Amino acid sequence: MAKKVTGQVKLQIAAGKATPAPPVGPALGQAQINIMEFCKQFNAKTASKDLEGFTIPVVITVYNDRSFTFVTKTPPASDLLRKAAGVAKGSGVPNKDKVGKVTEKQVVEIAKQKMPDLNAASVEAAINSIKGTARSMGIDIVP
């Protein structure tokens, strides 16, 4: 018989840096998950060099026998755009102050990377979504 799902926990954790300290510990404690076991598994899965410095969204499914499974998503589009543009953070007033530039090619690469997590029907729709995120961050898109 299949295990009964008792809940889902959604978190955003730095890649390879899950610790029992807040905010991870309290969120998992409420769901009655073995916190250290989750931290070890998450850190092992996200320890690769290409994810270093990114925040990774994770969806943890909790079962009635206190076991769990988790699915990691791709880093947020804003993190990928910030890395591509080489800026620390987006603009406070994106219509006036531009903080960086990304090329059309970089936007396409980000869209392809984000495609599994976006609810876009095509790569073109994903590209438009990433362009919108870049505009709202004050990042210019150059050909």
UniProtKB/Swiss-Prot annotation:
Give the GO terms filed under biological process for this record. Answer: translation
Gene Ontology molecular-function annotations? large ribosomal subunit rRNA binding; structural constituent of ribosome
Statement: the UniProt record of this protein carries the keyword Ribosomal protein: yes
Taxonomically, the superkingdom here is: Bacteria
Q: How is it modified after translation?
A: One or more lysine residues are methylated.
- SMART domains in the cross-refs: RL11
Keywords (A to Z) from UniProt: Methylation, Ribonucleoprotein, Ribosomal protein, RNA-binding, rRNA-binding
Q: Does the keyword rRNA-binding apply?
A: yes
Q: Which CDD domains match?
A: Ribosomal_L11 (cd00349)
What are its GO cellular component terms? cytosolic large ribosomal subunit
- What does this gene product do? Forms part of the ribosomal stalk which helps the ribosome interact with GTP-bound translation factors.
Note the PANTHER family from the entry. Answer: 60S RIBOSOMAL PROTEIN L12, LARGE RIBOSOMAL SUBUNIT PROTEIN UL11M
Q: Which family does it belong to?
A: Belongs to the universal ribosomal protein uL11 family.
Known HAMAP family for this protein? Ribosomal_uL11
Record text on subunit structure and interactions? Part of the ribosomal stalk of the 50S ribosomal subunit. Interacts with L10 and the large rRNA to form the base of the stalk. L10 forms an elongated spine to which L12 dimers bind in a sequential fashion forming a multimeric L10(L12)X complex.
Know the name of this protein?
A: Large ribosomal subunit protein uL11
| Source organism of this protein record | Koribacter versatilis (strain Ellin345)
Designated gene of the protein: rplK
